[in-house]
Amino acid sequence: MARIAGVDLPREKRVEVALTYIFGIGRPTSQKILSATGVDMNTRVRDLTEDEVNKLREYIDKTVKVEGDLRREISLNIKRLMEIGCFRGIRHRRGLPVRGQRSKTNARTRKGPRRTVANKKK
């Protein structure tokens, strides 16, 4: 089993698909990596030579931000938005949708389960 960027790639999958198991690499990035390293995208992971695995590993380490580094960068970006107090930062802080979705109804995923409020007696 090939291990790249701390992720074990599934042996039975094609390399193009297997690389997408790494956080931060999707299909387009996977295709760019394979064309840059000269590895055939239809090859199965189990059929990769040690040399090809090393090529992929080096290329990903040098050029693509993946796994922990990417997660850290994303969380730092969100913290920065919250610190400067911009609209997006405020929405993150309050746990509301950030990208302009309606929140009067819906938005339950972001807001969490309903907190029922007792009726006021007359």
Swiss-Prot record:
Cellular component, GO, one term: small ribosomal subunit
HAMAP family: Ribosomal_uS13
Membrane-spanning residues: none
Pfam families for the chain: Ribosomal_S13 (PF00416)
Species of the source: Brevibacillus brevis (strain 47 / JCM 6285 / NBRC 100599)
Function: Located at the top of the head of the 30S subunit, it contacts several helices of the 16S rRNA. In the 70S ribosome it contacts the 23S rRNA (bridge B1a) and protein L5 of the 50S subunit (bridge B1b), connecting the 2 subunits; these bridges are implicated in subunit movement. Contacts the tRNAs in the A and P-sites.
Subunit structure: Part of the 30S ribosomal subunit. Forms a loose heterodimer with protein S19. Forms two bridges to the 50S subunit in the 70S ribosome.
Recorded family membership: Belongs to the universal ribosomal protein uS13 family.
Alphabetized Gene3D superfamilies for the sequence: 1.10.8.50, 30s ribosomal protein s13, domain 2
Xref: InterPro entries: Rbsml_uS13_C (IPR027437), Ribosomal_uS13 (IPR001892), Ribosomal_uS13-like_H2TH (IPR010979), Ribosomal_uS13_bac-type (IPR019980), Ribosomal_uS13_CS (IPR018269)
Key words, A-Z: Ribonucleoprotein, Ribosomal protein, RNA-binding, rRNA-binding, tRNA-binding
Keyword Phosphoprotein applies: no
Name of the molecule in the record: Small ribosomal subunit protein uS13
This protein's record includes keyword Ribosomal protein: yes
GO MF entries: rRNA binding; structural constituent of ribosome; tRNA binding
GO biological process: translation
Annotated spans, Disordered: 95-122
